[in-house]
Amino acid sequence: MAQAAKKQNLGTGRRKTSSARVFLRSGTGQIIINGLPLDEYFGRETARMVVRQPLVKLDVQSRFDVYATVQGGGDSGQAGAIRHGITRALIQYDEEGGEGGTWRSTLRKAGFVTRDPRMVERKKVGLHGARRGTQFSKR
């Protein structure tokens, strides 16, 4: 007979071109991203801070273990995608009877629930970039 699966909550987060699947389990507070600890995966402290934000806001960083797989984009986009995924997983945990359904409003006020719609604007034909044109010469 198969062993009972450990209870976990799944949250999918996206930011720019990054996509993250986040698994939230009760534990001691370790954060593993693509098989590496958070401190090894992200070199910049700001990216690590962004990932921890939802847990710190709710003061539950030592109650959950976070396992995330993320692909696409760069450091900033990946950190934002993981944060979005953690937020969704926390809301799912909360609404299934965790804390009485109060976390969503707290996380929404902090701005973590809304998916950031900003994307890189495409390069246009005849321009150097999305908006930069050729240099104007009066004569």
From Swiss-Prot:
Looking up SUPFAM superfamilies in the UniProt record yields: Ribosomal protein S5 domain 2-like
Which BP terms in the Gene Ontology apply to this protein?
translation
Q: Which InterPro entries match?
A: Ribosomal_Su5_D2-typ_SF, Ribosomal_uS9, Ribosomal_uS9_bac/plastid, Ribosomal_uS9_CS, Ribsml_uS5_D2-typ_fold_subgr
Q: Which domain of life is it from?
A: Bacteria
**What's a single GO MF annotation on this record?**
RNA binding
A cellular-component GO term for this protein: cytosolic small ribosomal subunit
Q: Does the keyword Protease apply?
A: no
The UniProt entry, under Gene3D superfamilies, shows:
3.30.230.10
What keywords does the record list, in alphabetical order? Ribonucleoprotein, Ribosomal protein
To which protein family does this belong? Belongs to the universal ribosomal protein uS9 family.
This chain belongs to the protein called Small ribosomal subunit protein uS9
Gene from which this protein is expressed:
rpsI
